[in-house]
Amino acid sequence: GGSCGQCRVHIKEGGGDILPTELDHISKGEAREGCRLACQVNVKNDMEIELEESIFGVKKWDCEVISNDNKATFIKELKLQIPDGESVPFRAGGYIQIEAPAHHVKYADFDIPEEYRGDWNHFGFFDLESKVDEETIRAYSMANYPEEEGIIMLNVRIATPPPRNLSLPCGKMSSYIWSLKEGDKVTISGPFGEFFAKDTDAEMVFVGGGAGMAPMRSHIFDQLKRLNSKRKISFWYGARSKREMFYVEDFDGLAEQNENFVWHTALSDPQPEDNWEGYTGFIHNVLFENYLKDHEAPEDCEY
């Protein structure tokens, strides 16, 4: 417990002193105001707590898997159908929690397209298994935006052990999600979140890599498709090689349709067959060296 920092509450009375495990997520100023991580608070006496109003809008849905396709070697796009007549009233940048029952998953049963199987064979990942004897709950950001109604779309990276030590346990939730097939039933709850865009005209700079694509896509689609925003928006995305890039046509289309939007990709390990002439290296360095370093007022941007 205490690792994700998502269960913040404000304790107005009781609860004892803040624990060292909470200080990575809570500043001294926030602690003075009573901010705590709920999972770290021992309830020994009566307490008075204050919760965000949005918590009371949280619901559960039993969804059905529409598709679960690879978008990159180690990233799947899980698309879930919300029950008819229902909707998840989330904001761009929000997340849901997904439940995994006890399970025994064999990686050899995963549906992996041929173009991605080389790395899986090379690292011996098809020999892995995930055995979990209790329910697991994890949080994932939505990749869809609010007007893509009736669905929940997630980008899920498989959490394998390091190739040099495959005896370590696999990721409980990612293993379960990667095993899902069309028609399977999945329980989610939500919506949750605090990573929301501010209602200003400030320039927006989005930076992410890998499965961090999900909230970026949600935010950018929401700004340009739903809000028709005229804010200056740039997206800086990092991938290992050209094969690991996804949603390329979507973002190319947005750039063509919106003169206020540009996007850039940097590859950290481009392959010879990529014939890559774009940026190389890690995306945060590329962003700084090629844009923010010479920006007139980077502190005024919304990141």
From Swiss-Prot:
Gene Ontology MF annotations: 2 iron, 2 sulfur cluster binding; metal ion binding; oxidoreductase activity, acting on NAD(P)H, quinone or similar compound as acceptor
E.C. no: 7.2.1.1
Catalyzed reactions per annotation: a ubiquinone + n Na(+)(in) + NADH + H(+) = a ubiquinol + n Na(+)(out) + NAD(+)
Database matches in Pfam families: FAD_binding_6, NAD_binding_1
Domain 2Fe-2S ferredoxin-type, residue spans: 1-55
Region (Catalytic): 201-303
GO annotation, cellular component aspect: plasma membrane
Co-factor: note: Binds 1 [2Fe-2S] cluster.
This protein's UniProt keywords: 2Fe-2S, Cell inner membrane, Cell membrane, FAD, Flavoprotein, Ion transport, Iron, Iron-sulfur, Membrane, Metal-binding, NAD, Sodium, Sodium transport, Translocase, Transport, Ubiquinone
Annotated positions binding [2Fe-2S] cluster: C4, C7, C39
Keyword NAD: yes
Cofactor(s) the record lists: [2Fe-2S] cluster; FAD
Entry keyword annotation includes Flavoprotein: yes
Compartment list: Cell inner membrane
Protein family membership: Belongs to the NqrF family.
Assembly, per entry: Composed of six subunits; NqrA, NqrB, NqrC, NqrD, NqrE and NqrF.
Name under which the protein is recorded: Na(+)-translocating NADH-quinone reductase subunit F
Organism: Pseudoalteromonas haloplanktis (Alteromonas haloplanktis)
